[in-house]
């Protein structure tokens, strides 16, 4: 047999690709594994032992940071998206059932006729000056504010089902006969015009509507020669029956609080710093029109 007819090993003449014995052989056959990072539980070929992969750690840290940034973005963008959704709902109302008066995009106009009762009966701002000019404060300092008529007009728009935002304005006119020696029979009056922004939620079932509302706003007050502009806090509840698709009738009750209602009043070119929290309860009949 001639020499050139002898079959040669595929490794002969290709020493660069030849695989030596031992661990190096596996590296020569699979050169990509030489630079492959060691995973948890793998053995280092150079000395053995279990190692954490640095690249895996970097990936874990990077993914945690990305999740944190996404959560932060949602916390920042969420309220803005909610406001935009409310504005969009107001501009593009959903065509719902005509009897569904609490659906998003619906609006309500309310007219109320109520009786208002003050929850105080003593020394309203010292307007009669009985405490200042007469030693008998028990006789001359008391101002009696009597129950009176109140009227209110309100508007609310439902930004989503049951949840509404609106505005409420009312007028209260109370008569008073202060017991003082200067004008014992002259009637005084107390006038209040509160205007408040409101937020409410309405529970609806069948034809019954049960709204709960809270609000805060501006209040104008005038009593005798005293005038005050200040804060008013309101809370209201009602019960209405849906008569038709657009009209409902019911009753409501309202609590109004005027904190520090007599601070820094101006009375006959004289400033006083008497303070009092005025509180009123009003209840009456309401008529509502649903848009």
Swiss-Prot record:
Similarity comment: To T.pallidum TP_0733.
Annotated region (Disordered), positions in chain: 1-55
Keyword Transit peptide on entry: no
UniProt topology in membrane: Multi-pass membrane protein
Residue ranges crossing the lipid bilayer per the database entry: 74-96, 188-210
Coiled coil: none
Name the record gives this protein: Uncharacterized protein TP_0126
Primary localization: membrane
GO cellular component, one term: plasma membrane
Record's keyword terms, sorted: Cell membrane, Membrane, Transmembrane, Transmembrane helix
Alphabetized InterPro entries for the sequence: OMP/PagP_b-brl
Compartments in which it is found: Cell membrane
UniProt-listed SUPFAM superfamilies: OMPA-like (SSF56925)
